[in-house]
From Swiss-Prot:
It comes from the Eukaryota. The keyword Aminoacyl-tRNA synthetase does not apply. It is found in: Secreted. It comes from Terebra subulata. This is Teretoxin Tsu1.1.
């Protein structure tokens, strides 16, 4: 019973920071969520980050 709060918190943390650690099955949904919420600065920072600039929401430059 105590694992439910832990899972809930982990899901919240994952949804907040999933752009920093993109997974193949979550990249597209995360990009859409970011656009719908208008968090453009976070997306731009992500695109500048060599770790997560490969997300579908970032322009592929070379």
């Amino acid at each position: 019973m105590s694992c439910f709060p832990v899972l809930f918190v982990m899901m919240l943390l994952a949804s907040q920071s999933v752009w920093a650690f993109p997974e193949p099955e979550t990249r597209i949904g995360t990009a859409r969520d970011a656009e719908s919420m208008g968090v453009r600065s976070a997306v731009e920072e992500c695109c500048e980050n060599p770790v997560c600039k490969h997300t579908s929401g970032c322009p592929t430059t070379g």
